[in-house]
Amino acid sequence: NRLCCSQYGFCGTTSEYCSRVSGCQS
Protein backbone atom coordinates (compact mmCIF):
# COMPACT_ATOMS: atom_id res chain seq x y z
CA ASN A 1 0.00 0.00 0.00
CA ARG A 2 1.10 3.53 -0.72
CA LEU A 3 1.26 6.04 2.10
CA CYS A 4 0.86 9.69 1.15
CA CYS A 5 1.46 12.69 3.38
CA SER A 6 -0.04 16.13 2.98
CA GLN A 7 1.82 19.41 3.38
CA TYR A 8 0.34 19.64 6.89
CA GLY A 9 1.92 16.39 8.02
CA PHE A 10 -1.19 14.21 7.93
CA CYS A 11 -0.68 10.86 6.26
CA GLY A 12 -2.96 8.23 4.77
CA THR A 13 -3.53 5.88 1.84
CA THR A 14 -6.86 7.26 0.62
CA SER A 15 -7.38 9.63 -2.30
CA GLU A 16 -7.96 12.42 0.22
CA TYR A 17 -4.25 12.29 1.03
CA CYS A 18 -2.91 11.09 -2.30
CA SER A 19 -4.95 13.12 -4.78
CA ARG A 20 -7.20 15.81 -3.33
CA VAL A 21 -4.60 17.39 -1.07
CA SER A 22 -2.28 19.86 -2.78
CA GLY A 23 1.43 19.56 -2.14
CA CYS A 24 1.29 15.94 -1.04
CA GLN A 25 4.18 13.51 -1.30
CA SER A 26 3.97 9.81 -1.96
From Swiss-Prot:
User: What domain of life does the native source organism fall in?
Assistant: Eukaryota
Gene Ontology MF term list: chitin binding
Which ranges carry the Chitin-binding type-1 domain? 1-26
Disulfide bond keyword on record: yes
Q: Give the recorded use of this protein.
A: Has potential use as a flocculating agent in water treatment processes.
**What UniProt keywords are attached to this protein's entry?**
Antimicrobial, Chitin-binding, Disulfide bond, Fungicide
Fetch the Pfam families from UniProt. Chitin_bind_1
Which tissues is it found in, per the record?
Seeds (at protein level).
* GO terms (BP aspect): defense response to fungus; killing of cells of another organism
> Coiled-coil segments, which residues?
none
- What are the annotated disulfide bridges? C4-C18
Describe the function of this protein: Chitin-binding protein which functions in defense against chitin-containing fungal pathogens.
Quote the protein name from its UniProt record: Morintide mO4
- Annotated organism of origin: Moringa oleifera (Horseradish tree)
